[in-house]
Amino acid sequence: MSKIIYTKTDEAPALATLSFLPIVKAFAQTAGVDVETSDISVAARVLAEFPEYLTEEQRVPNNLEALGKLTQDPNANIIKLPNISASVQQLKAAIKELQGKGYAIPDFPDEPKNAEEEEIRRRYGKSLGSSVNPVLREGNSDRRAPKAVKNYARKHPHSMGEWKQWSQTHVSHMHSGDFYDGEQSMTLDKARTVRMELLLEDGTTKVLKPKIALLDKEVIDLMFMSKKALLEFYEREMEDCREAGILFSLHVKATMMKVSHPIVFGHAVRIYYKDAFQKHGALFDELGINVNNGMASLYEKITELPASLREEIERDLHACQVHRPRLAMVDSSKGITNFHSPSDVIVDASMPAMIRNGGKMWGADGKLYDCKAVMPESTFARIYQEMINFCKWHGNFDPTTMGTVPNVGLMAQKAEEYGSHDKTFESSDNGIARIVDIDSGEVLLEQRVEKGDIWRMCQTKDDPIQDWVKLAVRRARESDTPVIFWLDPYRPHENELIKKVKTYLKDHDTNGLHIEIMSQVRAMRYTLERVARGLDTISATGNILRDYLTDLFPILELGTSAKMLSVVPLMKGGGLFETGAGGSAPKHVQQLIEENHLRWDSLGEFLALTESLEHLAKNDDNAKAKVLADALDRATETLLLNDKSPSRKTGELDNRGSHFYLAKYWAEELAAQDENSELKAQFAPLAQKLEENEAAIVEQLNEVQGKSMDLKGYYLADEALAEKAMRPSPLFNEAIASLS
């Protein structure tokens, strides 16, 4: 049998899977396709890491490791749903929940006191941040808005805030002392094994990464961010923001850049509340407060103090706000600010939302205000300022007419910054950070750093670059759309890539294709001018811009990035099919618990499944899989045209109801097609059954709404309870079961 691996993840997509997967399995088995699940939720990953603490019955396999190996199989076919990129707070909450359910895993050591705790901290670190995607993404990224989705957005445009030319909103970034400012890069002339070390001022050497194997033609970079320059930057920007009377907002990606960005975030918090930290710093250290984890962790820790001392600290924190700018809010009604948690404001989602809102963010009074968007690292901050400039001059974009911006992203084999976590360090001393060839002793790259500076090494292998260029040319040819490589010749790393792109383009037939290389700001301006005229432009970018642009443009075009088609053609021949580019929607889960209404839109799952079946049809020469894929494609379009996507409002159609309509339309398409008589005969009775019982099924699905529910767990819900909640229509369940 052909096989599809369907991942079980977290939060809203995990709940949606309980409703949708039985439908997928029932339909797929008619084409000889076996659909298996693989649990890569944060709970499963934590448990897999500590088998020696568990009983035999409690142990779970390391599914992420197994899937990583599977990506090397030419027959791999994996559908990957969004998962939690856990912050420290989320990880600790998951650990606490698992311990409460009888799993005797160790506590998370905030400040490890011995070698054993260091090892526990290291092992838990594997589940922090974006730890899933780098393992599975053994290919480059092809993300685009399917035609049916784009057409729907044009006919049913989402709301867009109005931009004013006099808007004070702007982006602020460092102009010196950041990673861009001092980056060094080189392409290796041969395979080498290197180490990362810090040569201290007293002549001793501290080895930080003893052994890194590098390949011939690999691009390596060394860069650092100055702590001194960063703190001066924050002071300057906070004062400028206060004088301007606009909101201060900090935009980082602490989930992915899980070593560097929490540090960058923590420095902003300490500068903002500088007087309180100077007064209470010793006590905060004693309590083990680490504001790299946000103000939420500080408030949590001071609850242990006597009331008088706690109130004094709270007064001192509030007093700091008098001479600091107002903070942008994550949730005005609950008083949650931009500094609450580093994972609350994630740049690739927060910046597009602000731009879509006419350049405004929420203040503490629940009103919208202009803001200063602070992104310390200048490398990619400039693209957002370019878009803001464009919006101020031309006004907001029109979803009914704007063009689309598909992306071909370089990400395979942990390319660039997104693969640098294990090679990122906060310097413990002044000295020279360097990369040294172990065999020859040759110093390949070196930089002078000071205590507290963040320095890192990035790698980009040559095969992924060749594959990226090939994919860009293929997409240009298939879609007859210009491709722009967003590469800055003044950035050393990207200058190395430009040389390679120019070389590898010669390996392909580019006759009749429009392919250019532009710096990020020029590429953004060129793309926006085309978008405003309704023209399409493919962006070929590195790993970070892949992430940023595949949220930015879809949010403006479609209202969400969850409706993107996200395909990763694996370099060994298999396929990884990601369901959209959004997160795992904790607020959707909150609504389900409070009102038994799940507004998660599974369109991303429908699109990924279509591509997965298409891939299967080609790879396994499975004609029935092709019929299923074509029928699903038409059914998805019908679902959009008939407006059967989930409503945000309790009592109306939700995720479960949209799954019913998808199954109904899919069965009808299969019953109506003439390519395969066997499938036609199999699905005719189901189509009839769903048609006849439509009103009764929808009533059963909707009548359970409006009541609170308890799933007996968040990170590890009670499976029977959750399944019962997500499949509340006996009529629909029986109809799907009748297929097998």
Swiss-Prot record:
Up-regulation conditions: Expression is weakly induced at 30 degrees Celsius, the optimum growth temperature of the strain 13A.
Activity vs pH: Optimum pH is 7.0.
Record: residues binding D-threo-isocitrate: S130, N133, R137, R143, K253, Y418, R546
InterPro entries hit by this protein: Isocitrate_DH_NADP_mono
Annotated EC: 1.1.1.42
Keywords for this protein: Glyoxylate bypass, Magnesium, Manganese, Metal-binding, NADP, Oxidoreductase, Tricarboxylic acid cycle
Cofactor binding note of this UniProt entry: Binds 1 Mg(2+) or Mn(2+) ion per subunit. Mn(2+) is the most effective divalent cation in vitro, but the enzyme can also use Mg(2+), Co(2+) and Zn(2+), with lower efficiency.
Names of required cofactors: Mg(2+); Mn(2+)
Subunit structure: Monomer.
Annotated function: Catalyzes the oxidative decarboxylation of isocitrate to 2-oxoglutarate and carbon dioxide with the concomitant reduction of NADP(+). Cannot use NAD(+).
Protein name: Isocitrate dehydrogenase [NADP] 2
UniProt source species: Psychrobacter sp. (strain 13A)
Record lineage: Bacteria, Pseudomonadati, Pseudomonadota, Gammaproteobacteria, Moraxellales
